[in-house]
Amino acid sequence: KELITKAYDNKAAIVSFPELCITGYTCNDLFLQDTLIDEAYNSLIDLKKYTGQYEGMAVVVGLPYMYMGKLYNVAAVLMNGHIIGLVPKMNIPNYAEFYERRQFKEGFKGNVSVNIDGEDVDFGGSLICQFGSSNKVKLAIEICEDLWTPAPPSIRHALNGATIIVNLSASNETIGKSAYRRELVKGQSARLVCGYIYSTAGDGESTQDIVFGAHNLICENGTVLAEAKKFTNEAVYADIDVDRICSERRRMSTFDVNVDEDMKEAYKYVTCPELKKRTLELKRYFDKAPFVPDDKKERDARCEEILDIQTYGLKKRLEHTNCKNTVIGISGGLDSTLALLVTVRAFDILNLDRKGINCITMPCFGTTDRTYNNAVKMTEKLGCTLREINIKKSVRQHFEDIGHNEDVHNVTYENGQARERTQILMDIANQTNGMVIGTGDMSELALGWATYNGDHMSMYGVNASVPKTLVRHLIRYYADTCANKELSEVLIDVLDTPVSPELLPPNEDGTIHQKTEDLVGPYELHDFFMYHMLRFGVGPEKLFRIANIAFANDYSPAVIYKWLRTFTWRFFAQQFKRSCLPDGPKVGSVAVSPRGDLRMP
């Protein structure tokens, strides 16, 4: 009772206790005694009444229960002073240290009605609790050994709509078992795309022959949200994102396809009271950089894999078109640098001469010495062909032709330069029988931060599904592993250069005046918004809330709100640019290709 009260005070909505917690799992043949069975029943009634004072919280407890002359190992769902349902353990182990068949009968599919303390209660292995009017929070139960079998009941539960699986367990500790248990629970939550609450026995059990460590776990879709340290008997709390679970299942067209008919049995949906809605401080961790692993070893492995995907995508395109020359507009910025590095790798795999990589630098009104020099040095260190074409004269002629005043620095002024550059790249591609390699990244495409038919257009966009926050790490990884000190120094300086299209004149001291993140907002925010919106269908209100948690030490709520509005408006307004994107390789779970992941009007 104290634990139930404590859970309520901690604003828990669902509380789970271990298998047979009312009596203890290690009673052995005492389970055959009428006194123990009767007292367990009486304790259930007592706990049922006790939950009446904690409105809107579901409590799941375990006990031995007699039905039709046989004893079952069951879980009982209690809420608002009522017993919502009873679920029996389906798989009774009788091997190694387990001899449960000596006392318990296996559970059954389907459901029957039993009377407990004057109330009709559903009892059976095909029971799902649906809370109030919510069509998302659906709870089902399996007990300990059920999970360790080849076909756990949770598979049936999930395929019939359960989004949260509760497992009441009495899993003892042996060498290495906790690691296996952790992977088992985590893996099942991933396989079933569900929340999985695993509550197991601890210090309250006998240690006659086995020891229990209270290794409690809460997982969600392959992620461990909370884990108790063994032998501490601590309760763990976590926030399960049911919206995310439902979004992922909705996206997966194969979630319930080609399933055996016995998996799609007639389930009983028990309508429960609403879970209490309370404002609480989320305990869930939200990564500020969801595209970038925190661990360096994992991050380096991710970078290598992404570079391989980009490289082999381009390699195949070059082979298929019998193309031995490429054309890249080199600005000295992040995106063109990454595109060049990928192209170099592709040429090396194909044993093509790097001189076939035509790097075109096209300085104009906003070009600074820093970016220009980095572009030149980088091209030289990589052994590619460098061509410099100053476009000031041609852009001025274009302004004169269309009647635009060069002193008016508006969108015409900026985009005229971008389209002039693209025209030059396309013509040089024809001149060299080559292919224009696109440099734009996914973050820019999500925001529409590209000139339509300017830098927006190419013949193959190698960065099209790489977010800006990841571009930096890819270049850093290349700099750290290229074994060329001079090239590495150039790449590091590129990383230190502010992101800019350099379409407006520089400051008087020659530094970059036009900084992208001052205009459209921080890319770390936009990548966070993009990831959660496209990957999990998170709406603006929820997105604002979780962004405030993730960036609590970086941005004020007002700043986050400002850039969230910017992202949302630009994302939908700029779809026309994404509708005609060039081909490019998908590298992660989020992409904006109109032919693949993002098909929207």
Positions of the model-derived regions?
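ATP/NTP-dependent adenylation/nucleotidyl-transfer catalytic domains that generate, transfer
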Residues: N135-V137, V193-C194, S206, E220, ...
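Enzyme catalytic cores with a strong preference for nitrogen-chemistry domains
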Residues: K1-G329, R345-R354, L386
